[in-house]
């Protein structure tokens, strides 16, 4: 009975902890764990196979080998339970205690723990304030260290060589103590008085001025504080007792043939014990010092190898020349405890097989082979057979099943009914990679999958395999049915759009049946209803594509009260669409289906169905769509042949034109009119334009055909060319691919991204010649190499993202903040890339939104969740910007609140409490990662580079508005832009912005602010190949520091006789020209300097290298004239780190190579005296204070003297560094920048991701702050702390009327942020396990198990979703608050640095 009670206690022990604390283990603690000392290196007796007494597998220490049986066999069976055999010393108990009983080794000499010594920064080194090198010299017996100077002039911790030691001994006799080896270090650590050391350091910090010293001091203070707080003692970092792992965790297994397989740990322990025993014997014999020293050093090395092999010196290898796996290796890395056994486990009740298509299945079904089902559901079948009385025992049932009797299959059917199974396809990149289905038994051996879920699984049927898992418990079945069923996952969590969308052949079928063609049989007929249409079609009276009139009955279902109203109307449609209307669910307007069913339209149809009619109807509808699509795709019989690739007749002409243009430019280049760079640029431009023209001609040829209509006129209509309908419907292929088949392949890129200027003029139908084929190989090979690299990189990015965001869970409904982000439409190059409605859909409004010019009545009030209806309302009111709540500004102390997050994208309503939004965000960003390119944006290597834009042509009629534009009026009456951030927008009649364009510096603008413009009108133009310098005043030119042949080179054009001057590169000028700075200054007629309007700065322009001046000294210039121009470099394909690496760089917050330099404050620009390699840029504040910035000469400064800049504006071109944006502009602009940059990469690949996912990750990157002024807080200046801790501490200080700490936000990359989380378990299982655990142990960190990862590792439900309720229930059941829980449990489960907790539950693999 007593044991029964014990049994339950054991079970309870594991569930009832609320935190895990890790600390240094004291020698006494290690002895208290131990069941005896291991004295001998022997393992087992090789004759009897019994463990040796006192050896590494000793039964007396670790427990019996067989259950309830002592080693010598004197006591057997349960009745002797708990007896210790007097003959062999074994306790009679269960054999599994050998998994948990530890032993110990008493070390004859102390040994430093390698983790605290070598793991940087060295903890022992910091504690003693000695360098690692010095400590190692002491430990490995190369030098003495003074442990107690006494009255001598020696210093404590001073190193002495052998000679110095002997001299000192002669000089001072025994007045001082010095020693070497770990004893010395142990002694030094033991005698440190932490309190007084702390006081001394604090005084020193106050008085010191040097940065490096301050850093070292704060590090030491933090370390000593950690020791004081955790109750660890410094001398415990040097071990005197070594714990021995329980033997069953380092097993020794006999193989056949009398050999043994053993864990490497046994070898390492054997080594330690051997050396320890030898050392003990030498000490007893009083051996000579040098021998003892050598033995001590060897002991130190063997313990080092046991704890962390290879950390110091060469790794100890076994017989097979492989390094032995030490304790540290057991827990770190992909094969370590954390990632192999705790975070990823193999599951029983699972099977895998190849998948095939199941086009007749319903969306919630999957076909499961009978063989598999029988195996998976075996226990259930056994139980049912017994209950039915078909078998008396389980054994009999087993026989029945093995014989596969007829009744077994009936029983299996019953067992399976309503019992969902989970299907999973690896790689599982997002949560839709595992979904639940109801199994349908099928013959054969392949799993059948519903075609519509292929997109979510990213599955195809070319040999993919999938795994099946059976949820066993009732709760698991419930969750599978309610949350994971494929019918519940219609919308994608990444963007809220339907993911159950027909693709490929289904789309083709639907598109084919909904196309309208001229003059088909039955055109113009009128039908009373759709069934009449069907009859006519079946009897071949009408053709599928004929245009007809049909009376359609439209039923509207009120979503609120379910009232049904129906109305009929006669609609112009086609036979196919009328047939399609039969499967539309009630309440879905027919006009949605009365179009060509391209993939986009089908997606829109399903989306509308979901929003209007809800889940159930949509699922049924999607299935019907699929069946219909397959049926009509079969009827269509679409196939492609080589004749479908029609080559346009114009191709020849267009090519001839282009070749002539190229020739002309080549001649200009040879006569010196254009530079080599310009020639290359222009040639590439001509070819990309030509390629576009041919593509357009080709699409026109393929996409239209001439037909006679019913009246006999010849008209153009969309053709039914097989290739074209595949691309047009979105079933397969794209315009870019057809272009290569039937147009011209176009420009190719080299692997480095530069474009080969000779294009491929042929297409695949004509075939490539040898040279063209060769040029193509670049792209093809690069594509393959990239794909391999990409997959690995993308997976690693996903892993980092998940790790940084894993603990972001919705924890409350509203945090009450009024902060948020201001959303405006995204406009690029004049097109609205993403309208406001798409950006704010599913967000919560942070401030009331008013109509422009009406401040009385808000259209939308604060805290409204914007759904489709609200968004439409905002659009009608032409609102241009809305402030919405964002996770970045959420003030929840742990996790985020539902209001700041907004809509749950996959469900379409406000997000539930407990949703793991962090993981969803990480998956949504990581899953499309494999679609992103590695470097370049090419289609099969074909360069996709737009021809250089050199003007603005408006696309809509409206009025012009300038934003933020500084311009001067040219004599011709046009305006010339002299600012860089200027923009031109086109507003429609309602004042709504329709287009927006950036105006480059030096652009000539032909329209005025407020002018009316017509669509197609050009409003601005500029030279795309040259960057001009524009004069802002009228006057005469004076050259300064123009020295011919030194700073400038004269060039005369043979053809025109015009002279131009090119400024040389300062690096190439001689030493005598160091001080020269070529400047163009503008003076009046008398030669006096003119000033730039509204400033007192002279009107002068510093000329950068390579700029060209076409004017002569003394020439007159007018306002807006070009003084000089700077040629632009040959442009590469838009290939500034593209794709995946760009996303990774942004999330890792890496500084770009040559970052843009931003203005540190607002003011007027001027230039000071240059230094050797730098230019001096000065920004003068309004109050007259100046800020200087030294900029390398090779960087191009894009601002001119006298220009006004605002804080955070770019002054030197480049990629801005996110840290600078945060420092100068703050958190919101940084968030906006990251979102924009990351979205640009994804948008280019056509991937849609909702902004809020990127915001969630950004929030995690901004978790930490840096203390700038500690006030009265416990933090130190320059320390990085969790923002939440500072806020809490400050709140406490304010209530006591003390000075709160001041801080700046810090941006950490995702890897750094993951390692800096509060939970050490989560950080250790991510990367750098050793470092994380070392630090945690020294600090005595306690992990409150708040995140998801920690709970998975300790084997609990995660505190998210359904697990949230479980955790709340657990707290409630104990009836305690968190803090009481902590005080009650006293010491939470303690793990010590030799990772016992991590190892105790896992078998040696």
Curated annotation (Swiss-Prot):
Listed binding positions for Mg(2+) are: 460, 462, 464
The cofactors required by this protein are: Mg(2+); Zn(2+)
Question: What is this enzyme's EC?
Answer: 2.7.7.6
Cofactor binding mode, per the note?
Binds 1 Mg(2+) ion per subunit.
Assigned keywords, A-Z: DNA-directed RNA polymerase, Magnesium, Metal-binding, Nucleotidyltransferase, Transcription, Transferase, Zinc
Q: A cellular component term (GO) from this record?
A: DNA-directed RNA polymerase complex
Q: How does it assemble?
A: The RNAP catalytic core consists of 2 alpha, 1 beta, 1 beta' and 1 omega subunit. When a sigma factor is associated with the core the holoenzyme is formed, which can initiate transcription.
HAMAP family recorded: RNApol_bact_RpoC
Q: What is this protein called?
A: DNA-directed RNA polymerase subunit beta'
The species this protein was found in: Xanthomonas campestris pv. campestris (strain B100)
């Amino acid at each position: 009975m007593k044991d029964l009670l014990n049994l339950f206690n054991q079970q309870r022990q594991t569930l009832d902890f609320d935190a895990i604390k890790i600390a240094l283990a004291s020698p006494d603690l290690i002895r208290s764990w131990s069941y005896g000392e291991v004295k001998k290196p022997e393992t087992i007796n090789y004759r009897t196979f019994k463990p040796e007494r006192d050896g590494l597998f000793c039964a007396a220490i670790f427990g019996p080998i067989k259950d309830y049986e002592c080693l010598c066999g004197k006591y057997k069976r349960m009745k002797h339970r708990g007896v210790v055999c007097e003959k062999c010393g074994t306790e009679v108990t269960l054999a599994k205690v050998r998994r948990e009983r530890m032993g110990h080794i008493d070390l004859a000499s102390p040994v430093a723990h390698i983790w605290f010594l070598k793991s940087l920064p060295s903890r022992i080194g910091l504690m003693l304030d000695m360098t690692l090198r010095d400590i190692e010299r002491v430990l490995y017996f190369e030098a003495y260290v003074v442990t107690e100077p006494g009255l001598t002039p020696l210093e404590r911790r001073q190193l002495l060589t052998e000679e110095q030691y002997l001299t000192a001994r002669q000089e001072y006799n025994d007045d001082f103590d010095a020693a070497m080896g770990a004893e010395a270090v142990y002694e030094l650590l033991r005698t440190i008085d932490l309190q007084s050391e702390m006081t001394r350091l604090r005084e020193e910090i106050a008085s010191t001025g040097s940065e490096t010293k301050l850093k070292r001091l704060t590090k030491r203070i933090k370390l000593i504080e950690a020791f004081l707080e955790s109750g660890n003692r410094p001398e415990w970092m040097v071990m005197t007792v070594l714990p021995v792992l329980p033997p069953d965790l380092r097993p020794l297994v006999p193989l056949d043939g009398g050999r043994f397989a053993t864990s490497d740990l046994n070898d390492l322990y054997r080594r330690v014990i051997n050396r320890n025993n030898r050392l003990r014997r030498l000490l007893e014999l009083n051996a000579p010092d040098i021998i003892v020293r050598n033995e001590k050093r060897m002991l130190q090395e063997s313990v080092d190898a046991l704890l962390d092999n290879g950390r110091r010196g060469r790794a100890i290898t076994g017989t097979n020349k492989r390094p032995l796996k030490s304790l540290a290796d057991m827990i770190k890395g992909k094969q370590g405890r954390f990632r192999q056994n705790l975070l990823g486990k193999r599951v029983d009740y699972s099977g895998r097989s190849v998948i095939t298509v199941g086009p007749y299945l319903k969306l919630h079904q999957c076909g499961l082979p009978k063989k598999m089902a029988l195996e998976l559901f075996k226990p259930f079948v056994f139980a049912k057979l017994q209950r039915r009385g078909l078998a008396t025992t389980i054994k009999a049932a087993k026989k029945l099943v093995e014989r596969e009797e007829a009744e077994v299959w009936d029983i299996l059917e019953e067992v399976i009914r309503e019992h969902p199974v989970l299907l999973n396809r690896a790689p599982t990149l997002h949560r839709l990679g595992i979904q639940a289905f109801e199994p349908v038994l099928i013959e054969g051996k392949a799993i059948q999958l519903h075609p519509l879920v292929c997109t979510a699984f990213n599955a195809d049927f070319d040999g993919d395999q999938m795994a099946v898992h059976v949820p066993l418990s009732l709760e698991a079945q419930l969750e599978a049915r309610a949350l994971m069923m494929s019918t519940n996952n219609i919308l994608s969590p990444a963007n809220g759009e339907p993911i159950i969308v027909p693709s490929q052949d289904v789309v083709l079928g639907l598109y084919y049946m909904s196309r309208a063609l001229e003059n088909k049989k039955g055109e113009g007929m009128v039908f009373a209803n759709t069934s009449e249409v069907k009859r006519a079609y079946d009897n071949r009276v009408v053709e599928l594509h004929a245009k007809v009139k049909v009376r359609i009955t439209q039923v509207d279902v009120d979503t609120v009260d379910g009232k049904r109203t129906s109305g009929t109307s006669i609609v112009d449609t086609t036979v196919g669409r009328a047939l399609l209307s039969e499967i539309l669910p009630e309440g879905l307007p027919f006009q949605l289906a009365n179009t060509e069913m391209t993939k986009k339209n089908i997606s829109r149809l399903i989306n509308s169905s979901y929003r209007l009619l809800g889940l159930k109807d949509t699922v049924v509808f999607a299935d019907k769509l699929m069946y219909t699509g397959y049926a009509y795709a079969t009827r269509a019989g679409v196939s492609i042949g080589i004749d479908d690739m029609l080559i346009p007749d114009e191709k020849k002409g267009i090519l001839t034109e282009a070749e002539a243009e190229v020739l002309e430019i080549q001649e200009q280049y040879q006569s010196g009119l254009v530079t080599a760079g310009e020639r290359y640029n222009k040639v590439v431009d001509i070819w990309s334009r030509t390629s576009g023209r041919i593509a357009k001609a080709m699409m026109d040829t393929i996409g239209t055909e001439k037909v006679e209509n019913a009246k006999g006129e010849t008209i153009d209509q969309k053709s039914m060319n097989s290739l074209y309908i595949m691309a047009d419907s979105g079933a397969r292929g794209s315009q870019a691919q057809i272009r290569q088949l039937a147009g011209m392949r176009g420009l190719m890129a080299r692997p480095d991204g530069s474009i080969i200027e000779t294009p491929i003029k042929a297409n695949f139908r004509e075939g490539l010649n040898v040279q063209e084929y060769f040029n193509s190989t670049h792209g093809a090979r690069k594509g393959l190499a990239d794909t391999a690299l990409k997959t690995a990189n993308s997976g690693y990015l996903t892993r980092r993202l998940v790790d940084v965001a894993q603990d972001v869970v919705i924890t409350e409904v509203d945090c009450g903040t009024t902060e948020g982000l201001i959303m405006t439409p995204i406009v690029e190059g004049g097109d609205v890339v993403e309208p406001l409605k798409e950006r704010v859909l599913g967000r919560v409004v942070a401030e009331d939104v008013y109509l422009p010019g009406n401040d009385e009545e808000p259209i939308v009030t604060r805290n409204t969740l914007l759904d489709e209806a609200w968004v439409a309302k905002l659009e009608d009111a032409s609102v241009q910007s809305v402030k919405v709540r964002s996770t970045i500004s959420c003030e929840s102390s742990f996790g985020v609140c539902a209001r700041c997050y907004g809509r749950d994208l996959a469900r379409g309503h406000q997000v539930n409490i407990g949703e793991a939004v962090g993981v969803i965000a990480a998956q949504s960003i990581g899953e499309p990662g494999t679609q992103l390119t590695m470097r370049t944006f090419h289609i099969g290597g074909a360069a996709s580079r737009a021809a250089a834009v050199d003007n603005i042509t408006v696309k809509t009629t409206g009025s012009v508005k300038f934003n933020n534009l500084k311009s001067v009026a040219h004599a011709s009456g046009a305006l010339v832009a002299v600012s860089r951030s200027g923009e031109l927008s086109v507003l429609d009649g309602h004042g709504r912005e329709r287009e927006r364009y950036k105006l480059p510096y030096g652009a000539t603008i032909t329209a005025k602010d407020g002018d009316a413009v017509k669509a197609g009108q050009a409003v601005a133009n500029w030279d795309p190949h040259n960057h001009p310098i524009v004069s802002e005043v009228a006057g005469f030119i004076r050259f300064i520091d123009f020295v011919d042949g030194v700073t400038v080179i004269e060039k005369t054009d043979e053809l025109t006789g015009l002279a131009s001057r090119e400024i040389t590169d300062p690096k190439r000028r001689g030493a005598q020209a160091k001080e020269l700075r070529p400047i163009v200054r503008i003076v009046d007629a008398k030669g006096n300097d003119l000033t730039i309007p509204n400033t007192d700065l002279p009107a002068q322009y510093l000329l950068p290298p390579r700029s060209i001046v076409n004017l002569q000294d003394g020439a007159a210039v007018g306002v807006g004239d070009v003084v000089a121009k700077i040629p632009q470099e040959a442009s590469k394909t838009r290939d500034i780190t593209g794709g995946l690496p760009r996303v990774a760089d942004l999330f890792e917050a890496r500084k770009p190579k040559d970052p843009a330099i931003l203005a540190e404050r607002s003011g007027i620009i001027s230039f000071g005296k240059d230094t050797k390699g730098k230019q001096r840029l000065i920004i003068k504040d309004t109050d007259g204070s100046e800020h200087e910035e030294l900029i390398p000469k090779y960087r191009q400064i894009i601002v001119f003297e006298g220009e006004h800049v605002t804080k955070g504006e770019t002054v030197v071109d480049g990629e801005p560094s996110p840290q600078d944006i945060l420092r100068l502009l703050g958190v919101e602009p940084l968030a906006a920048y990251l979102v924009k940059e990351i979205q640009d990469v994804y948008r280019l690949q056509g991937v849609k991701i909702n902004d809020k996912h990127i915001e969630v990750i950004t929030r995690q990157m901004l978790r930490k702050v840096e203390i700038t002024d500690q006030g009265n807080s416990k933090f130190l200046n320059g320390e990085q702390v969790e923002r939440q801790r500072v806020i809490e501490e400050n709140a406490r200080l304010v209530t006591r009327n003390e000075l709160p700490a001041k801080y700046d936000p810090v941006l950490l990359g995702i890897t750094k942020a993951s390692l800096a989380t509060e939970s050490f378990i989560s950080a250790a299982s991510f990367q750098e396990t050793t470092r994380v655990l070392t630090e945690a142990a020294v600090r005595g960190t306690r992990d409150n198990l708040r995140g998801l990862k920690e709970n998975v590792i300790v084997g609990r439900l995660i505190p998210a979703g359904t697990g949230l309720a479980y955790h709340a229930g657990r707290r409630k059941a104990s009836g305690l608050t968190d803090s009481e829980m902590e005080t009650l449990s006293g010491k939470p489960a303690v793990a010590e640095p030799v990772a016992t907790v991590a190892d105790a539950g896992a078998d040696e693999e």
